[in-house]
UniProtKB/Swiss-Prot annotation:
It comes from Acyrthosiphon pisum secondary endosymbiont phage 1. This is Putative protein p6. It comes from the Viruses. Residues 58-77 are annotated as: Disordered. Residues 67-77 have a biased composition (Basic residues).
Amino acid sequence: MFHQAKSPTHSTLTNFLRTALILFPLFCGEYILTSGSMSNRTASSDKHPSIKPSAISNFARISPSSTRRRRAMARFE
């Protein structure tokens, strides 16, 4: 307890790394599933707005503290 209060930067750094590890496969998996094949990437640019709500809803369903992770997700948009 005292060690946690002593070094808040360490806990925030590990939390950010943990969110990045969770967020990258989720976001890339959403993008690959929505876009389909690699050759359809130019055609899937109009589908791009439909990726963000589903990814955010999946992410909010997984994580209990979704407000901090939505802020982290807003950096990737």
